[in-house]
Amino acid sequence: MRRLLSVAPVLLWLITPLAFAQLPGITSQPLPGGGQSWSLPVQTLVFITSLTFIPAILLMMTSFTRIIIVFGLLRNALGTPSAPPNQVLLGLALFLTFFIMSPVIDKIYVDAYQPFSEEKISMQEALEKGAQPLREFMLRQTREADLGLFARLANTGPLQGPEAVPMRILLPAYVTSELKTAFQIGFTIFIPFLIIDLVIASVLMALGMMMVPPATIALPFKLMLFVLVDGWQLLVGSLAQSFYS
Protein backbone atom coordinates (compact mmCIF):
# COMPACT_ATOMS: atom_id res chain seq x y z
CA MET A 1 0.00 0.00 0.00
CA ARG A 2 2.82 2.37 0.87
CA ARG A 3 4.55 1.56 -2.43
CA LEU A 4 1.33 2.32 -4.31
CA LEU A 5 0.98 5.67 -2.56
CA SER A 6 4.59 6.54 -3.31
CA VAL A 7 4.24 5.65 -6.99
CA ALA A 8 0.86 7.40 -7.43
CA PRO A 9 2.31 10.93 -7.88
CA VAL A 10 4.68 9.66 -10.57
CA LEU A 11 1.86 7.88 -12.40
CA LEU A 12 -0.32 10.98 -12.16
CA TRP A 13 2.50 13.10 -13.54
CA LEU A 14 2.91 10.71 -16.49
CA ILE A 15 -0.81 10.33 -17.22
CA THR A 16 -1.72 14.04 -17.08
CA PRO A 17 0.02 15.04 -20.37
CA LEU A 18 -1.58 12.06 -22.11
CA ALA A 19 -5.03 13.07 -20.86
CA PHE A 20 -4.62 16.66 -21.95
CA ALA A 21 -3.30 15.50 -25.30
CA GLN A 22 -6.74 13.99 -26.02
CA LEU A 23 -8.46 17.36 -25.53
CA PRO A 24 -8.86 19.68 -28.51
CA GLY A 25 -6.41 22.53 -28.19
CA ILE A 26 -6.71 26.21 -28.96
CA THR A 27 -5.69 26.21 -32.60
CA SER A 28 -6.35 28.35 -35.64
CA GLN A 29 -6.55 27.23 -39.24
CA PRO A 30 -6.09 29.41 -42.33
CA LEU A 31 -9.15 29.96 -44.52
CA PRO A 32 -9.13 30.03 -48.34
CA GLY A 33 -9.87 33.76 -48.30
CA GLY A 34 -6.83 34.53 -46.21
CA GLY A 35 -8.48 34.68 -42.77
CA GLN A 36 -8.24 32.36 -39.81
CA SER A 37 -10.73 29.95 -38.25
CA TRP A 38 -10.40 29.23 -34.53
CA SER A 39 -10.98 25.81 -33.02
CA LEU A 40 -14.31 24.74 -31.53
CA PRO A 41 -13.38 25.43 -27.86
CA VAL A 42 -12.54 29.06 -28.67
CA GLN A 43 -15.74 29.50 -30.68
CA THR A 44 -17.77 27.98 -27.84
CA LEU A 45 -16.11 30.27 -25.30
CA VAL A 46 -16.83 33.33 -27.44
CA PHE A 47 -20.45 32.24 -27.92
CA ILE A 48 -21.06 31.67 -24.20
CA THR A 49 -19.43 34.99 -23.36
CA SER A 50 -21.57 36.79 -25.93
CA LEU A 51 -24.73 35.48 -24.25
CA THR A 52 -24.05 37.78 -21.28
CA PHE A 53 -24.36 40.80 -23.59
CA ILE A 54 -27.78 39.84 -24.96
CA PRO A 55 -29.78 41.90 -22.38
CA ALA A 56 -27.65 44.97 -23.10
CA ILE A 57 -28.00 44.46 -26.86
CA LEU A 58 -31.76 44.01 -26.50
CA LEU A 59 -32.12 47.18 -24.44
CA MET A 60 -29.68 49.48 -26.22
CA MET A 61 -29.45 48.38 -29.86
CA THR A 62 -33.04 47.50 -30.80
CA SER A 63 -36.49 49.07 -30.78
CA PHE A 64 -37.26 47.67 -27.30
CA THR A 65 -36.43 50.88 -25.39
CA ARG A 66 -38.89 53.06 -27.29
CA ILE A 67 -41.66 50.47 -27.15
CA ILE A 68 -41.50 49.69 -23.43
CA ILE A 69 -41.32 53.38 -22.45
CA VAL A 70 -44.37 54.21 -24.57
CA PHE A 71 -46.30 51.31 -23.04
CA GLY A 72 -45.38 52.50 -19.55
CA LEU A 73 -46.49 56.07 -20.31
CA LEU A 74 -49.76 54.77 -21.76
CA ARG A 75 -50.48 52.87 -18.56
CA ASN A 76 -49.81 55.99 -16.49
CA ALA A 77 -52.01 58.10 -18.76
CA LEU A 78 -54.88 55.64 -18.37
CA GLY A 79 -54.47 55.73 -14.60
CA THR A 80 -54.15 51.94 -14.30
CA PRO A 81 -50.74 51.34 -12.67
CA SER A 82 -51.20 47.56 -12.55
CA ALA A 83 -53.16 46.84 -15.72
CA PRO A 84 -51.83 45.56 -18.02
CA PRO A 85 -49.31 43.92 -15.68
CA ASN A 86 -45.58 44.25 -16.23
CA GLN A 87 -45.27 40.71 -17.59
CA VAL A 88 -47.83 41.40 -20.31
CA LEU A 89 -46.19 44.68 -21.33
CA LEU A 90 -42.74 43.08 -21.41
CA GLY A 91 -43.99 40.14 -23.48
CA LEU A 92 -45.79 42.41 -25.94
CA ALA A 93 -42.73 44.67 -26.19
CA LEU A 94 -40.45 41.68 -26.84
CA PHE A 95 -42.63 40.22 -29.59
CA LEU A 96 -43.11 43.63 -31.19
CA THR A 97 -39.34 44.17 -31.03
CA PHE A 98 -38.76 40.84 -32.76
CA PHE A 99 -41.28 41.81 -35.46
CA ILE A 100 -39.65 45.20 -36.07
CA MET A 101 -36.10 43.84 -35.99
CA SER A 102 -36.83 40.79 -38.18
CA PRO A 103 -35.43 42.39 -41.39
CA VAL A 104 -32.21 43.22 -39.51
CA ILE A 105 -32.01 39.71 -38.04
CA ASP A 106 -32.55 38.14 -41.47
CA LYS A 107 -29.78 40.25 -42.96
CA ILE A 108 -27.39 39.30 -40.15
CA TYR A 109 -28.24 35.63 -40.66
CA VAL A 110 -27.66 35.74 -44.43
CA ASP A 111 -24.61 38.00 -44.51
CA ALA A 112 -22.77 36.86 -41.38
CA TYR A 113 -23.99 33.61 -39.82
CA GLN A 114 -24.42 31.47 -42.94
CA PRO A 115 -20.96 32.23 -44.42
CA PHE A 116 -19.37 31.73 -40.99
CA SER A 117 -21.13 28.39 -40.42
CA GLU A 118 -19.94 27.25 -43.84
CA GLU A 119 -16.39 28.39 -42.94
CA LYS A 120 -16.28 30.87 -45.81
CA ILE A 121 -15.34 33.79 -43.56
CA SER A 122 -13.53 34.15 -40.26
CA MET A 123 -15.11 35.02 -36.92
CA GLN A 124 -13.83 38.59 -37.10
CA GLU A 125 -15.34 39.09 -40.55
CA ALA A 126 -18.63 37.59 -39.34
CA LEU A 127 -18.74 40.03 -36.42
CA GLU A 128 -18.05 42.97 -38.72
CA LYS A 129 -20.70 41.92 -41.24
CA GLY A 130 -23.18 41.16 -38.46
CA ALA A 131 -22.72 44.59 -36.90
CA GLN A 132 -23.34 46.43 -40.18
CA PRO A 133 -27.16 45.90 -40.33
CA LEU A 134 -27.44 47.03 -36.70
CA ARG A 135 -25.39 50.15 -37.51
CA GLU A 136 -27.67 50.99 -40.42
CA PHE A 137 -30.79 50.49 -38.28
CA MET A 138 -29.48 52.67 -35.45
CA LEU A 139 -28.25 55.39 -37.81
CA ARG A 140 -31.73 55.69 -39.35
CA GLN A 141 -33.24 56.34 -35.91
CA THR A 142 -30.50 58.61 -34.54
CA ARG A 143 -30.66 62.39 -34.77
CA GLU A 144 -27.70 64.30 -36.15
CA ALA A 145 -27.73 66.59 -33.11
CA ASP A 146 -27.20 63.63 -30.79
CA LEU A 147 -24.38 62.29 -32.96
CA GLY A 148 -22.75 65.71 -32.98
CA LEU A 149 -23.05 66.00 -29.19
CA PHE A 150 -21.24 62.75 -28.44
CA ALA A 151 -18.72 63.38 -31.22
CA ARG A 152 -17.80 66.68 -29.51
CA LEU A 153 -17.63 64.99 -26.11
CA ALA A 154 -15.31 62.32 -27.53
CA ASN A 155 -13.14 64.90 -29.35
CA THR A 156 -13.29 62.93 -32.57
CA GLY A 157 -13.63 65.93 -34.84
CA PRO A 158 -16.13 66.25 -37.69
CA LEU A 159 -17.51 62.93 -38.92
CA GLN A 160 -16.97 62.17 -42.60
CA GLY A 161 -20.25 60.33 -43.11
CA PRO A 162 -22.36 57.55 -41.58
CA GLU A 163 -19.68 54.93 -42.22
CA ALA A 164 -17.19 56.89 -40.13
CA VAL A 165 -19.34 56.93 -36.97
CA PRO A 166 -17.72 54.67 -34.35
CA MET A 167 -19.88 52.45 -32.17
CA ARG A 168 -18.84 54.24 -28.97
CA ILE A 169 -20.51 57.38 -30.35
CA LEU A 170 -23.41 55.73 -32.15
CA LEU A 171 -24.67 53.72 -29.16
CA PRO A 172 -25.24 56.60 -26.67
CA ALA A 173 -26.54 58.84 -29.46
CA TYR A 174 -29.04 56.17 -30.50
CA VAL A 175 -30.27 55.61 -26.94
CA THR A 176 -30.64 59.37 -26.38
CA SER A 177 -32.65 59.71 -29.59
CA GLU A 178 -34.85 56.77 -28.64
CA LEU A 179 -35.61 58.30 -25.23
CA LYS A 180 -36.55 61.61 -26.83
CA THR A 181 -38.78 59.94 -29.41
CA ALA A 182 -40.48 57.80 -26.74
CA PHE A 183 -41.28 60.85 -24.60
CA GLN A 184 -42.63 62.73 -27.63
CA ILE A 185 -44.99 59.85 -28.37
CA GLY A 186 -45.92 59.67 -24.68
CA PHE A 187 -46.78 63.38 -24.65
CA THR A 188 -49.13 62.86 -27.59
CA ILE A 189 -50.78 59.95 -25.78
CA PHE A 190 -51.26 61.94 -22.58
CA ILE A 191 -53.17 64.86 -24.17
CA PRO A 192 -56.64 63.25 -24.69
CA PHE A 193 -56.58 61.55 -21.29
CA LEU A 194 -55.48 64.78 -19.61
CA ILE A 195 -58.45 66.56 -21.20
CA ILE A 196 -60.78 63.92 -19.76
CA ASP A 197 -59.24 64.40 -16.30
CA LEU A 198 -59.72 68.19 -16.51
CA VAL A 199 -63.34 67.87 -17.67
CA ILE A 200 -64.23 65.36 -14.94
CA ALA A 201 -62.53 67.47 -12.26
CA SER A 202 -64.38 70.61 -13.44
CA VAL A 203 -67.74 68.82 -13.43
CA LEU A 204 -67.18 67.46 -9.94
CA MET A 205 -66.19 70.91 -8.70
CA ALA A 206 -69.31 72.44 -10.27
CA LEU A 207 -71.50 69.82 -8.60
CA GLY A 208 -69.84 70.39 -5.25
CA MET A 209 -68.55 66.82 -5.10
CA MET A 210 -65.06 67.68 -3.93
CA MET A 211 -64.74 64.49 -1.88
CA VAL A 212 -65.12 62.22 -4.90
CA PRO A 213 -61.71 61.38 -6.44
CA PRO A 214 -61.70 62.52 -10.09
CA ALA A 215 -59.42 59.65 -11.13
CA THR A 216 -62.06 57.09 -10.16
CA ILE A 217 -64.75 58.79 -12.25
CA ALA A 218 -62.42 59.48 -15.19
CA LEU A 219 -61.11 55.92 -15.51
CA PRO A 220 -64.23 54.43 -17.22
CA PHE A 221 -64.31 57.32 -19.71
CA LYS A 222 -60.60 56.85 -20.50
CA LEU A 223 -61.08 53.14 -21.09
CA MET A 224 -64.15 53.78 -23.24
CA LEU A 225 -62.24 56.32 -25.36
CA PHE A 226 -59.28 53.96 -25.76
CA VAL A 227 -61.54 51.10 -26.83
CA LEU A 228 -63.64 53.21 -29.22
CA VAL A 229 -60.61 54.43 -31.17
CA ASP A 230 -59.11 50.90 -31.17
CA GLY A 231 -56.19 52.18 -29.15
CA TRP A 232 -54.01 49.08 -29.11
CA GLN A 233 -54.09 48.68 -32.88
CA LEU A 234 -53.47 52.39 -33.36
CA LEU A 235 -50.60 52.50 -30.88
CA VAL A 236 -48.85 49.29 -31.96
CA GLY A 237 -49.23 50.16 -35.64
CA SER A 238 -47.89 53.67 -35.11
CA LEU A 239 -44.93 52.35 -33.13
CA ALA A 240 -44.03 49.85 -35.85
CA GLN A 241 -44.39 52.45 -38.61
CA SER A 242 -42.25 54.95 -36.70
CA PHE A 243 -39.19 52.76 -37.33
CA TYR A 244 -39.73 52.63 -41.09
CA SER A 245 -40.77 56.22 -41.80
Swiss-Prot record:
The chain crosses the membrane at residues 45-65, 88-108, 185-205, 209-229. Residues 1-21 form the signal peptide. Keywords: Bacterial flagellum, Bacterial flagellum biogenesis, Bacterial flagellum protein export, Cell inner membrane, Cell membrane, Membrane, Protein transport, Signal, Transmembrane, Transmembrane helix, Transport. GO terms for biological process: bacterial-type flagellum assembly; bacterial-type flagellum-dependent cell motility; bacterial-type flagellum-dependent swarming motility; chemotaxis; protein secretion by the type III secretion system. Its main location: membrane. It is found in: Cell inner membrane; Bacterial flagellum basal body. Pfam families: FliP. It comes from the Bacteria. The keyword Chaperone does not apply. It is a multi-pass membrane protein. Plays a role in the flagellum-specific transport system. NCBIfam families: fliP, PRK12797.1. Belongs to the FliP/MopC/SpaP family. This is Flagellar biosynthetic protein FliP.
